[in-house]
Amino acid sequence: MSTAAATSVAPAPKPKGNLPIFLVLVLLALGLPFLGKGGIIAGVVIGCAVLGVPLFGIIGLLTLAAFVVYLGADQPNEFPLIERSRGLGDQVTLLAVPLFIMSGAVMGRGEISSRLIDFARACIGWIPGGLAMSAVFACVFFAAISGSSPATVVAIGAMMAPTLVKAGYGERFTHGLLTSAGSLGILIPPSIPMILYPIVNQTAVIQVETLFASGFGPGGVMAVIFAASCYAIGVRKNRQEGKPLGPDLYRGLLALLFPVVFYPFLDGGLGMLEVGVKLAVYLVVIEKTTDFSFRQVLRSAGRGFWALVFPVAILGGIYGGIYIAVEAAAFSVVYAVLVEVFIHRALTMRDVLGVFRETGVFLGSLLVIMVAALSFEEFLEARDVPHMLVQWIEGMNLEPWQFLLLVNGVLLLVGMAMDILSAMFVFVPLLAPIANALGIDPIHFGIIFIVNLEIGYLTPPVGLNLFVASTLFERPLGHMIKSVAPFILLMLGGLAMVTYWPDLSVGLGRHIMGDDEAPVVEVPATGGALEELPDETEETGAEDDVPDGVQSLEEMMRELEMGEEGGDLDDDAGDLDGEETDAEDDGRVLSLEEMMEAAGVE
């Protein structure tokens, strides 16, 4: 499947099946231009949607119409399309996008995904619901390699869906789980939206590597929530099959003990030897009392060695300072091709060239959208829209938590109508300055933005994963919407945790990167950032011999001008540029103006 689908929009409503809706849209498109300039622009957008114009065309025409209507067509130099196109060439980070897409597409067609599934089943298949859990963690692992949500759905869903249904899991649960878990691809680094967010957010200097690290916590929370639902479904399935509840609870308790083995080591409380002993005891217990097989784990790990090493090599190299995100993306392409073509022998070079062609098509459509969206951002800045929004929000006297609640509601609605990349280009420039004015960390806001639009992958009418899964599983769109509905509710709970627990993302990300400093704010949204500067009458902090110990700027200037403290100054103090001053003649202290005049300062 071509990745270019990521930038398309839902088909225009067809008159035959949706005639009332179609007629309403046509009337709106024809009538809105009579309502003024804003109506003209809205009419252009709705008219394009009725005609089925692709997304890049809608955004491009929206931008062009906005500039023509508000600035006039006689000033072509004011149109920033060409300048924005040239400016994208200066964004080195942008090169990582097609490279990560290439590597993900190569692995999706190869055998890496199947080997990851085998390893996950060997590790956690013995837990109630373990087969479904293995699908979740295979999605997490594959997402950490490919960075693409639709690619994760296709790669893992194609192999796990028949297996889960055959094992007794309901079809609706199976399809909903695989479609929803696949959306973790945009939250687990490396992630395409995480690469683009620092480019779009012009209010702060954000490192892509720090944003990557900040995605681990929220991604892990979502994965654990899905795994817990799998455990509950697994226990219920076993009870329906007449299996006693006792063993399920025992196995679940053993599974919960696994993090206890490793957390003290990660927290610096235990060394490798202590952890090794605890892990050995843990493995012996579960192997003797459950269906777990350590030998099977080793066998599947050996078979999937190159797949397991991949994320370690990519992310470890980034966080270890070996290479930056762009270099890691280039390395991922070389690694994927070498493994799938020459080690696994699952692909030929002709297959790889086909993947590269598809990636080129996707990148071309993406760049058109980026140029149009960034140009529209230029229009919004020219009309001072972000500043007006900031003033409007500040006038509402919202607390940060209230603003984040409002943002979540807006973005959930946006996710239903726009794909994630387009939503980022349109709404980040509008909302980021407001978040900055309220003191919300730019990285935290970026993670919240991405989690919201991750849910948008599952919501109609343009939820991309719904269309991908509908095609993959050969089921109607209505079936897929019902399948993902319970998982959307679970993800909303995870969204609340991410929103109101900043340390889950920001704290963990900076801990991983060893950076305790917040991103540098470049463009303050309002004058509020300047209010924090010290007043010019504040103390300078330099101690001297005056009675108060510390002099303010005003006091020092007054002393220079009026000679409060001192009488005569040394002759050397009166020398400027090696010349004698008039201070020697009359024995007085020079004023500040006289000193500047003597120094030749205008």
List each model region and its residues:
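Alpha-helical transmembrane segments of multi-pass membrane transport proteins
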Residues: 2-602
